[in-house]
């Protein structure tokens, strides 16, 4: 209602601004006898102070009209905008909505890869409407789209900032941003592991490792003779299936009778003697020895008889080896060996033999304990030491010859 009231005032002022002179003249000159305005002026001259004078009204209207003439464009623009908004409030847009969040979210979910342009959902038909030629979108839809995009971009930027902060914190400290986030992350990992374990447990044992299961089953059936490692919970299912097909093992009561009786015999008949049957003769026969059955004559009989008779010795033909065997019993004379180069090496010459005889044995090595320690020389004064005669110097050749003769003498006469 307020909008309509102000719109009517603006329209009236615009109409007056376009026709100012006739209105002013009519207000100043034209008087109705029936109106209070005209009567008050003529009939009641004492009431001029209570009512505004025509001159003041004329001056006020002139000021308003002059102000409006100066800002005519602004007034017309505001008037047109108000008219458009008024018309939009009266006539709703074809595909407008009430502005609720669920409608907005449904309105802007669009497949952008297939069609381009703005999209919305009509509240009346509940159909998706695009901005192609022939379809109209209201101003409210455009504003909603812009707000939605801004909110989405804001959330994306905020998420990126938070992620960057968390990643930097992880790189520095190796932990989550806060203790609460760290706890949530650990809880999620634990739930993920539990889900994986539950999925693994749902797989039957025979489907996990068929080859290993078969080997373990074989080891269990053969009383673990193979010595392979096995687990009972893996072989239980397979052994159960195998044992279900086999008959139950014999008990201690019927272990003796089951050897001679069939399994079809009921337990009451085990105490009473059974009637004779065909199987009795068969069981008695293996206990008695069977007579030897004569074999048919064959060609091999003559060969077997001939093998027991010793064959006469057959005379061998004379050969060259007979004379050799007789000669081996007589001892052969020693034959002289031919002279060779090694004879000189084996028989050493006379000088070498004499030198070997003359070689004296090696001197005996004395131990440290057996060797008598020579007394330490007494210290003498310098004067006494100078009085002693100096040792004579000998030539090197004489020392060598003397040393050699002493050594040879020791070797010859040990």
UniProtKB/Swiss-Prot annotation:
Provide the primary localization.
secreted
Bias (Polar residues) ranges: 252-262
User: Which compartments does it reside in?
Assistant: Secreted
Q: Which sequence ranges form a coiled-coil region, renumbered to this chain?
A: none
- Keywords of this entry: Coiled coil, Glycoprotein, Secreted, Signal
Q: Where is the composition biased (Basic and acidic residues)?
A: 356-384
| Stretches with biased composition (Basic residues) | 390-402
Annotated region Disordered: the residues are: 242-262, 335-402
Q: Which GO terms describe its cellular component?
A: extracellular region
Glycosylation sites recorded in the entry for this protein: 111
Extract the signal peptide range: 1-18
Checking PANTHER family in the record gives:
NUCLEAR PORE COMPLEX INTERACTING PROTEIN, NUCLEAR PORE COMPLEX-INTERACTING PROTEIN FAMILY MEMBER B15-RELATED
What's this protein's family per the entry? Belongs to the NPIP family.
Name it.
Answer: Nuclear pore complex-interacting protein family member B7
Which species is this UniProt entry from? Homo sapiens (Human)
């Amino acid at each position: 209602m307020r909008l309509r009231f102000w719109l009517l005032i603006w329209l009236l002022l615009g109409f007056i601004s376009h026709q100012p002179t006739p209105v002013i003249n009519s207000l100043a000159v034209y008087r109705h006898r029936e109106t209070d305005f005209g009567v008050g002026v003529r009939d009641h001259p004492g009431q001029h102070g209570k009512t505004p004078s025509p001159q003041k009204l004329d001056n006020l209207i002139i000021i308003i009209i002059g102000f409006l003439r100066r800002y005519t464009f602004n007034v017309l623009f505001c008037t047109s905008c108000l008219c458009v908004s008024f018309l939009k409030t009266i006539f709703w847009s074809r595909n407008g909505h009430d502005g609720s969040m669920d409608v907005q979210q449904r309105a802007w979910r669009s497949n952008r890869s297939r069609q381009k342009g703005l999209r919305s959902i009509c509240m009346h038909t509940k159909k998706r409407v695009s901005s192609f030629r022939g379809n109209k979108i209201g101003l409210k839809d455009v504003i909603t789209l812009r707000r939605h995009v801004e909110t989405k971009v804001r959330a994306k930027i905020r998420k990126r900032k938070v992620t960057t902060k968390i990643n930097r914190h992880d790189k520095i400290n190796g932990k989550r941003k806060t203790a609460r986030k760290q706890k949530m992350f650990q809880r999620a990992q634990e739930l993920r592991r539990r889900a994986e374990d539950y999925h693994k447990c749902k797989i039957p044992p025979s489907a996990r490792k068929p080859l290993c299961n078969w080997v373990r089953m074989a080891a269990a059936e053969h009383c673990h003779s193979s010595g392979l490692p096995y687990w009972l919970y893996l072989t239980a299912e397979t052994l159960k299936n195998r044992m279900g097909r086999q008959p139950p093992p014999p008990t201690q009561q019927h272990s003796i009778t089951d050897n001679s009786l069939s399994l079809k015999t009921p337990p009451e008949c085990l105490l009473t003697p059974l009637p004779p049957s065909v199987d009795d003769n068969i069981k008695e026969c293996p206990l008695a020895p069977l007579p030897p059955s004569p074999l048919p004559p064959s060609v091999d009989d003559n060969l077997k008889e001939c093998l027991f008779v010793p064959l006469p010795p057959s005379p061998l033909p004379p050969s060259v080896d007979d004379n050799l065997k007789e000669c081996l019993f007589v001892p052969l004379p020693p034959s002289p060996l031919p002279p060779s180069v090694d004879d000189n090496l084996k028989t050493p010459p006379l000088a070498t033999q004499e030198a070997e005889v003359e070689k004296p044995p090696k001197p005996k090595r004395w131990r440290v304990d057996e060797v008598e320690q020579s007394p330490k020389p007494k210290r003498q004064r310098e004067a006494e030491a100078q009085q002693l005669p100096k040792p004579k110097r000998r030539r090197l050749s004489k020392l060598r010859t003397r040393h050699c003769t002493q050594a040879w003498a020791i070797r010859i006469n040990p």
